[in-house]
A protein has these predicted regions:
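Active-site-adjacent betaalpha module
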Residues: 28-45, 54, 88-89, 106, ...
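Bacterial N-terminal signal peptides
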Residues: 11-22
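Short catalytic/ligand-binding loop motif for oxyanion handling, primarily in non-cytosolic enzymes
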Residues: 101-105
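A short alpha/beta connector and helix-capping loop motif
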Residues: 42, 60-86, 90-92, 97
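Bacterial N-terminal signal peptides that target proteins for export
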Residues: 2-13
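Short, well-ordered beta-to-alpha junction loops that form the rim of enzyme active sites
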Residues: 96-99, 187
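Short, conserved active-site loops that position catalytic residues or coordinate cofactors/metal ions
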Residues: 49-65
Length: 253
C-alpha cells in the first residue's frame, strides 16, 4: 500500500480517504506500483465520457457490441452511483459528449471506427445550433441520467469528435475551475474513456479510472474492455471499482 502525502495540510478525513481507496483496490500481482489517488475537495472532479443512448440504451446503435459488457459490469448503475455521490457531496461533474453534425460526414479520410460510426449514424445531430430530433435520439443522454446531467453542478463541455478531449474544451473548463484531479468514467472503455485518460495525463492532471463504470465493444478476436483495463493499469494513477470510489468520495466530504 502506498499512501501519497505530498499535501501536508490534508485533513484527517482526506488522509483516511486515500487509505480507503488504496485498501479497497484489487490486489495487484503485475509488479507495477500503485501510486494511489486521494480525493481532495475543491481539486477533484468526476468526468464522464459519452453517457449517451447509442452506447447505453438497448435501442442504441452500438448496443449489439457493447451491451454484454455494459450489463456484466453494471455500467449504467455504476455511473449513476458516481453521479449521485458527486452531487450529494458537491463535487463538480464534467460531461464530455460525442456529437456528429452533417458537416462531419464529409471528412475525406477516417479511421476504422470513424467510418463505422458515420455509417450507422452514431451520435448524429441535425445541426450544431439545433436540437431538432435530439430528444430520445442516440445522441441524447440516457434518460435516467438526465436529472444528473441537468444538475446545476454539472458542466457539459463542447463535443469531442473522434475519441479524446483534444477537440473540445474539457481541459479549459477543468482548469478554469481549479481542478487538478480527475475521477474518470463513461463510455467506451478503450476508445473515448481511454483517450480522455491519456490526454488528461499529458495535460498534467492526476487521473484515476473507475473500472466498472465503463464498458467496451466485444467482437470476434477483439475485447475492447480487456484492452482498456491493461492500459488503465499502466497509465492511470489508480484504478478502483465503483463501491470503493463512492466510499472515498463520501469520506472526503
Amino acid at each position: 500500500m502506498k499512501l501519497t502525502t505530498h499535501l501536508p495540510h490534508l485533513s484527517f478525513a482526506v488522509l483516511a480517504t486515500a487509505i480507503l481507496v488504496s485498501q479497497t483496490a484489487p490486489a495487484q500481482a503485475d509488479g507495477l506500483p500503485d501510486p494511489g489517488f486521494d480525493v481532495v475537495p475543491g481539486l477533484t472532479a468526476l468526468v464522464v465520457t459519452d453517457p449517451q443512448n447509442d452506447f447505453l440504451s438497448p435501442n442504441g446503435v452500438a448496443w449489439g457490441v457493447v451491451g454484454a459488457s455494459v450489463e456484466a459490469n453494471g455500467t449504467i448503475e455504476n455511473i449513476d452511483a458516481l453521479f449521485t455521490a458527486a452531487h450529494d457531496t458537491g463535487m463538480p461533474v464534467f460531461v464530455s459528449p460525442h456529437y456528429y453534425f452533417p458537416q462531419d460526414h464529409n471528412w475525406q479520410f477516417e479511421g476504422a471506427l470513424e467510418v463505422l460510426m458515420h455509417k450507422i449514424g452514431m451520435f448524429d445531430r441535425s445541426d450544431a445550433l439545433s436540437i431538432d430530433g435530439f430528444e430520445g435520439s442516440g445522441a441524447d443522454w440516457l434518460e435516467s441520467y438526465k436529472p444528473h446531467i441537468e444538475h446545476e453542478n454539472t458542466i457539459v463541455t463542447s463535443p469531442h469528435k473522434v475519441f479524446g478531449p483534444e477537440t473540445n474544451d474539457l481541459v479549459l473548463q477543468l482548469r478554469k475551475r481549479g481542478i487538478s484531479k480527475i475521477i474518470l468514467s463513461g463510455m467506451s472503455a478503450n476508445l473515448c474513456t481511454e483517450s480522455h485518460m491519456r490526454e488528461l495525463q499529458e495535460q498534467g492532471f492526476e487521473v484515476m479510472v473507475v473500472s466498472d463504470a465503463t464498458a467496451a465493444a466485444q467482437l470476434p478476436g477483439l475485447d475492447g474492455y480487456a484492452a482498456a483495463l491493461t492500459n488503465f493499469r499502466m497509465i492511470a494513477s489508480h484504478v478502483a471499482d465503483t463501491d470503493a470510489t463512492v466510499a472515498a468520495i463520501r469520506a472526503a466530504h
